[in-house]
């Protein structure tokens, strides 16, 4: 059964079809949630919340071909809402699990990058993370965040310019 068939079944109330759709892209969903939440537990909680929301709203999906972008947008909004409720600043964490840390220098570099990113405003952080860490194109980021593509480009450009000033200022 292909993705469109699974989406049609999910719209009819088939939970297994919905779970299969999500499992087919589980790595992408997890990486996206992790980019926002910064740790495994919160990322998995966000994924669970996304599944509940998807199941409750799957019948509202007009275009079955847009399922994955629609579901990722729900995941991003779920992460943002969770962070907002906690009144936390967006914490774009690095993966702290030892299996992903090859050596001390790599860990230190990732930490430095995250430290610098946290000095940007939340919108610039989000755009830069989605573009360079999640490898998304401008159009996808625009759809995911519900902002015009030009605004995405502007946030990335201004964020990178600010990073350059921050980093340059510290090493001069």
What are these regions (language model features)?
Residues 1-27, 35, 114, 118, ...:
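N-terminal module of bacterial RNA polymerase sigma factors
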Residues 21, 25, 29, 50, ...:
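Residue-level preference for hydrophobic side chains embedded in well-ordered alpha helices
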Residues 30, 40-57:
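Conserved RNAP core-binding helix
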Residues 41, 115-126, 134-151, 162-165:
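Helix-turn-helix DNA-binding module
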Residues 88-117:
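Internal acidic/polar
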């Amino acid at each position: 059964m292909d993705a469109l068939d699974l989406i049609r079944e999910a719209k009819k109330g088939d939970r297994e079809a919905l779970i299969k759709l999500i499992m087919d892209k589980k790595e992408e969903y997890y990486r996206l949630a992790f980019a926002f939440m910064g740790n495994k537990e919160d990322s998995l909680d966000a994924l669970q919340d996304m599944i509940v929301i998807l199941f409750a709203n799957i019948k509202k999906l007009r275009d079955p071909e847009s399922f994955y972008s629609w579901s990722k947008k729900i995941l991003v909004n779920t992460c943002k809402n969770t962070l907002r409720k906690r009144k936390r600043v967006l914490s774009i964490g690095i993966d702290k699990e030892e299996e992903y840390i090859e050596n001390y220098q790599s860990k230190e570099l990732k930490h430095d990058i995250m430290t610098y990113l946290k000095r940007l405003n939340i919108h610039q952080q989000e755009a830069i993370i989605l573009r360079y860490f999640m490898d998304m194109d401008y159009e996808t980021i625009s759809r995911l965040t519900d902002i015009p593509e030009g605004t995405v480009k502007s946030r990335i450009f201004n964020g990178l310019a600010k990073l350059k000033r921050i980093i340059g200022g510290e090493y001069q």
